[in-house]
Each structure stands twice: as structure tokens, then as C-alpha cells.
Amino acid sequence: SMKLWNNRNYISFDFTVYEKNIHIMSQPMGTLRSISTDDNAKALMNAKKYYTSNILIFDAGFGTLDLYDIVNRKANSKETFAQFGMRAILEETGKRIQERSGVAIRSAAMQNALERGAFTITERKGVKISTKTEGFADLLEAATKEICEQAVEKVINMYNALDEYDYLILTGGTSAVWEPYIREYFQAIERLTVVMGNENCPDLDIIFCNVRGYYMYLIEWLRRKSIQK
């Protein structure tokens, strides 16, 4: 149910969804679709090279890192790791802040600290209270790099140092933060090309690449369906 315009009451809707109209796509596959299609859901010139190459999709978000590999045109597996992502970065940053300054920042308060770029240290002596602001950009950067290195180490161990892969496709908000590190780590691998998930739609935030791919697939599917009628 939902409210429409100035209507004070909720209006209920009933929808019937048939199984034949349900299509499930894994999250990282949305990015593969996205980098292969233009804004009219038409295949780009480079679409063929992606679908005929060995690809590892690296989807780092807030809570998890999802890895999806395609080798010899076959989707092999999807792996999910909860210890890599922005949540892990913030938790590690919080630990470093507490170790250095003795201040415990709750997860709910971390967003405010990030927006300010600093946190407040409160000291009390009797009835006298003093406060001072302290930055933590260095701790955040160190935590970001550490979690990224752990994630890359996992990838290297699981996928034979990416020796068989042509493309490493980065998608997800945390991947955008890690991009400089990842490019540095893999720059000497001749065969491997690092590609951002929004390479053909740079004005789109990378967190929406998967969704764009779903949408483009839907348009393509509806177009094929209309032609078949």
C-alpha cells in the first residue's frame, strides 16, 4: 500500500506476478551487462571481448565482497566474504582511534565523524569539562589500505594470482575507494586489464552499475519479446 499525492489514506494494490515473467540475475552479472551495453540497451563494440574473455568481477560493497568469475564463457562460481568491505574498514578505523586516543566511537556515530573528518575527545576533571577535536584521516587511510590488501591477498590465493584472467572488473562503492590500490597491485600483470564497472557511463555512481545492468537486460528482454509476437 502507498499514499498518492495529497491523499491521507493508503491505497492498496494487488499484483499477480507469474513465474514466466521472473528472471533472476546474480548481482555482479548486472555489472557485466552494464559495461557491455549502451544507454539504449544495445550491445557495445567491446561486448564480445568481455563475453569471450576470462573475467573476474570484484564487487566490494558496504557489508561484503562478492567475487564472480567467468572462464571459457562459463560462470564458475560466486564467492562472498563478510570480512571485506566498508563495514570492515570502519570497524578497523574505530579500533585504531580507540588505541590512539582512547575514544570509542559507536558504529552509528561513525558517519557523523566521517562527515566532519574528526571526532571529539571529552575530558572531565571534577565539574570542569574540556573538549578537543582530533582528525583521523591517517587512521582511515591506513585501515582502508589494510582491508584492501587483505581482500587482494584472498583473490590472489583463490584465483592463482589471476594468471588465467583477462579482465578484473571493479564494481561497488568500496571498489571505487580501493581502485588506486588495486591498479597498483596488479599493474605488472601483462595479460590483465583492470576495468571500472561504470567505464561506459562515467557520470553514473559505481554503486548503481549492477542495477543499470538489470535494467538494460530488462529492456533487451522486452525488445526481444515484442519482436517475437
Per-segment meaning from a language model:
Residues S1-I55, K74-S77, A82, M86, ...:
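Nucleotide/phosphate-binding catalytic cleft detector across ATP-hydrolyzing
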